[in-house]
């Protein structure tokens, strides 16, 4: 089976590349935006045909949440048109499958209990809106595809909250971090292993949307404090409210995801957030 992983140089794509070594029965093709432009329909169609691709793990996304507010066309090109082009190419492939990564930003963040896959979506920013349109394209397609919504992704690869906090913690005596946004982080390595685990699963007659993040509930403030503690960095973390840290794009105040469906449907256990964070920090520091 030939599998295409888009967004291969991002956090998740990089983790899949490392973890895929354990899956020798598959042929993996890893491409980033420079080597494969998913916004060009003919390019993606030709690639999938020439390489006999039957499964796509779509990690490609425009994820610059604040920039998206002023770069709407760029966000739409990847998050909407890119998805449309992948679907159009896969339609011509027999028994094709798609694993697509989406986001907690499709919700408005006003819930007080973890979001289920069946809850109403109401994105409050351009990034979330474009990701939701991408979801709708998949839901309305004939492709056997599943959408995995995730949140607060970090990794030893790329730029993310964990690495930023570690760097700033070494440079400064104290940092202000938001305490009134609640959710759960996702170690990209755990998500990568989920994507690989799903490769041989039958997507027919299954739910189309699943939620996945690490287990636990915390704020960005809690997360930052734990990063400093586990990394043994002497930096004081001060809690601030969202209103004290204005950004171009609004963030959901509450984005905890209910993961019951994926745990029950695929009989999986999800690692606790602190255990995964500990593992990631160890890799970063080594």
Q: Residue locations for each model-derived region?
A:
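N-terminal Rossmann NAD(P)H-binding glycine-rich loop of SDR-like oxidoreductase domains
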Residues: 3-21
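NAD(P)H-binding glycine-rich loop region in Rossmannoid oxidoreductase-like domains
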Residues: 41-78
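NAD(P)-cofactor binding segment of oxidoreductase domains
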Residues: 70-99
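Catalytic helix-loop patch of NAD(P)-dependent Rossmann-fold dehydrogenases
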Residues: 77-85, 106-148, 153
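NAD(P)-dependent short-chain dehydrogenase/reductase
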Residues: 136-183, 189-190, 196-197
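Substrate-binding strand-loop-helix patch
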Residues: 156, 181-190, 212-230, 279
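Mid/C-terminal beta-alpha module of Rossmann-like enzyme folds, strongest
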Residues: 201-246
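Conserved C-terminal active-site "lid" loop/helix of NAD(P)H-dependent oxidoreductases
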Residues: 219-221, 225, 241-280, 284-285
């Amino acid at each position: 089976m030939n599998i295409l992983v888009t967004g291969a140089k991002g956090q998740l794509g990089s983790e899949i590349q490392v973890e895929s070594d354990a899956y020798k029965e598959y042929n993996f093709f890893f491409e980033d935006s420079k080597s494969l432009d998913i916004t060009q329909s003919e390019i993606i169609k030709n690639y999938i045909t020439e390489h006999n691709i039957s499964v796509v793990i779509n990690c490609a996304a425009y994820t610059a949440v604040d920039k998206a507010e002023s770069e709407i066309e760029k966000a739409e090109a990847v998050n909407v048109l890119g998805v449309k082009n992948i679907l159009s190419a896969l339609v011509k492939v027999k028994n094709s499958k798609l694993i697509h990564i989406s986001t907690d930003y499709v919700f408005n963040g006003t819930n007080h209990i973890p979001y289920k896959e069946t809850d109403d979506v109401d994105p409050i920013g351009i990034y979330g809106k474009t990701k939701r349109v991408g979801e709708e394209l998949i839901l309305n397609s004939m492709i056997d595809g599943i959408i995995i919504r995730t949140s607060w992704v970090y990794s030893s690869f790329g730029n993310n909250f964990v690495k930023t906090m570690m760097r700033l913690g070494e440079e400064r005596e104290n940092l202000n971090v938001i305490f009134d946004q609640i959710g759960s982080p996702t170690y990209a390595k755990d998500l990568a292993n989920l994507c690989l685990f799903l490769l041989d699963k039958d997507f027919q007659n299954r739910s189309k949307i699943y939620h996945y993040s690490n287990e636990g509930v915390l704020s960005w403030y809690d997360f930052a404090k734990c990063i400093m503690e586990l990394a043994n960095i002497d930096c004081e973390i001060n809690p601030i409210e969202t209103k004290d840290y204005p950004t171009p794009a609004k963030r959901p105040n509450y984005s905890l995801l209910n993961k019951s469906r994926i745990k029950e449907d695929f009989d999986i256990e999800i690692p606790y957030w602190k255990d995964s964070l500990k593992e990631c920090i160890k890799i970063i520091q080594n």
